[in-house]
């Protein structure tokens, strides 16, 4: 078992909407079970995000961009692309392909968000290319689409792990 850090020691993040179930173990941000969502204290306008993630079989999570637009993380073996599957902006934009390394393997997102235009690269393949997000995802923190907002990692659907989360300004 590696070194563990309670979330209280993780600077720049806080749990909202539920129980604190997040831990940092050997540099991996881990949600151990169904619990709260994890939100950055920082707010972002136009940005590029790199994040690596790992989910268990039947896992379900997501990354809310600016706290408003959910990029889906879900176990979807042999699925056809849909707006509720991995690579999608939940409920709005369908990926061109399901490009997953599967459960229990590391996957990566490289996401660029400028205004409401989003590009999503999943495991090295562009699955959404500079498309407009038509509205906010259910569960969004607010509806002020012109304002900067936080990143939010979904923890209310069960276990998930993240590492190498890097946000840089777009442009």
Question: What do these predicted ranges mean?
Answer:
Residues 1-171:
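Carbohydrate-interacting regions of secretory-pathway proteins
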């Amino acid at each position: 078992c590696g070194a563990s850090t309670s979330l209280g020691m993780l600077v720049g993040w806080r749990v909202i909407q539920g129980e604190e179930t997040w831990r940092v173990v050997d540099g991996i941000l881990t949600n151990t079970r169904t619990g709260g969502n994890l939100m950055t204290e920082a707010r972002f306008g136009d940005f590029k995000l790199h994040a690596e993630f790992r989910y268990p079989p039947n896992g379900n999570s997501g990354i809310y961009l600016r706290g408003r637009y959910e990029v889906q993380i879900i176990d979807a073996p042999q699925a056809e692309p849909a707006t509720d599957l991995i690579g999608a902006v939940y409920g709005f934009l369908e990926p061109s392909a399901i490009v997953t390394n599967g459960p229990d393997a590391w996957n990566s997102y490289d996401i660029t968000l400028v205004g409401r235009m989003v590009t999503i690269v999943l495991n090295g393949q562009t699955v959404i290319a500079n498309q407009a997000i038509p509205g906010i995802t259910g569960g969004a923190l607010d509806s002020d689409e012109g304002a900067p907002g936080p990143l939010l990692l979904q923890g209310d659907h069960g276990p998930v792990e993240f590492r190498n989360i890097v946000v840089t300004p777009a442009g």
